[in-house]
């Protein structure tokens, strides 16, 4: 309902409108849950929130589901890759994806210096490693004004192509 093609009077979404006009548009679609992690669990497992028991992010709660869509696709011969954020535990749990290029930043637990090394963001966050190589070791997303589920904002201090959204798009195109 927040798309130009849906008739919203103020929101301008020309690129999404173009994709919808040229492809398939689902005007009655809805998310099983409007929060990213429970919605991801619903998409991956086919279970409702009542049955997958995710209400949001919780540190250290494993994703222990017997069946997940990425695994079924991989088993069916599809080449699967996850690009972007997963926010699952443990951090490098594949959920059935064959390859993962992650940006799982923002969450305090994984930035805690006392977290086990394999769970620390510097170990598993592909984007953070890339950003530090591109913009210098001191480059940091959280200090740049981006925080998980926050309304706080600051101007992005790096070049536009270094932004997590552009990195995710570039990595997705590289995969395709």
Where is each model-derived feature located?
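Formylglycine-dependent sulfatase
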Residues: 1-176
């Amino acid at each position: 309902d927040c798309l130009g093609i849906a008739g919203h009077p103020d929101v301008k979404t020309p690129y999404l409108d173009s994709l919808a006009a040229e492809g398939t548009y689902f005007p009655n679609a809805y998310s099983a849950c409007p929060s990213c992690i429970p919605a991801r669990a619903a998409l991956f497992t086919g279970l409702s929130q009542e049955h997958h028991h995710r209400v949001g992010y919780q540190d250290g709660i494993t994703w222990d589901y017997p069946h997940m869509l990425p695994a079924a696709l991989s088993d069916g011969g599809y080449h699967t890759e996850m690009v972007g954020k997963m926010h699952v535990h443990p951090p490098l749990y594949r959920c059935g994806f064959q390859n993962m290029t992650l940006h799982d930043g923002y969450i305090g637990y994984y930035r805690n210096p006392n977290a086990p090394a394999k769970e620390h963001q510097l170990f598993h966050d592909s984007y953070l490693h890339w950003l530090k190589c591109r913009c210098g070791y001191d480059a940091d997303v959280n200090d740049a004004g981006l925080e998980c589920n926050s309304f706080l904002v600051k101007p992005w201090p790096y070049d536009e192509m270094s932004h997590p959204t552009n990195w995710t798009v570039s990595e997705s195109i590289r995969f395709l």
